């Protein structure tokens, strides 16, 4: 989906939502913000300063994406949460904090090997909801400044989704959060909602 004639401002520390039909351009717009796609026209700015190719890696290092289609390692829970870190460099207290924020710590405590439980190829030993909570924990471990949740709670039941979004109230305001969702309950606490249609921002408002 091509994004056209669109301009948006996202204040630091805010939580915004991108809503619209499947294929409307929500994910493409989020990928442009993350620098995963480069605009052929227009610019991505930070505090009014355009981000250049030289600055883009530093920007991306401060961003985290929790997609709907999660890719997990055939490794331990601990290694999956601290994805990209050497085993000896993993901070277990930070791992537990990330698991608590994603409402997954109680499940891990109940597992025979705890953090060292192997999850199988792409998390085959976990349920869909558990895989998504683990992916959220990975983002929380990175302490990202910009967090994009692309239908990240779609496989969670209503109570768990509520718990995860409540956890975002505690940790999310330390970063800027962009939520892509279909459920109205998911975007209820967003400061600003952008409706995307056919690659354009059709309307901007809040939940009320």
Over which residues does each language-model region extend?
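ABC-type nucleotide-binding domain
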Residues: 4-208
């Amino acid at each position: 989906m091509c994004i056209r004639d669109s301009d948006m401002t996202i204040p630091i520390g805010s939580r915004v939502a991108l809503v619209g039909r499947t294929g409307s351009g929500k994910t493409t717009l989020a990928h442009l913000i993350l620098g995963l796609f480069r605009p052929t026209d227009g610019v991505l700015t930070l505090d009014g300063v355009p981000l250049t190719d030289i600055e883009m890696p530093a920007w991306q290092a401060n961003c985290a994406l929790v997609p709907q289609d999660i890719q997990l390692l055939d490794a331990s829970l601990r290694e999956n949460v601290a994805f990209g870190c050497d085993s000896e460099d993993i901070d277990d207290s930070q791992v537990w904090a990330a698991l608590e924020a994603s409402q997954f710590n109680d499940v891990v405590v109940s597992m025979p090997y705890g953090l060292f439980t192997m999850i199988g190829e792409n998390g085959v030993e976990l349920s869909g909801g558990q895989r998504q909570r683990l992916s959220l924990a990975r983002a929380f471990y990175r302490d990202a400044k910009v967090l994009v949740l692309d239908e990240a709670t779609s496989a969670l039941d209503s109570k768990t989704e509520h718990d995860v979004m409540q956890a975002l109230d505690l940790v999310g305001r330390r970063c800027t959060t962009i939520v892509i969702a279909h459920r109205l309950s998911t975007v209820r606490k967003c400061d600003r909602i952008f409706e995307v249609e056919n690659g354009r921002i059709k309307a901007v408002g809040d939940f009320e």
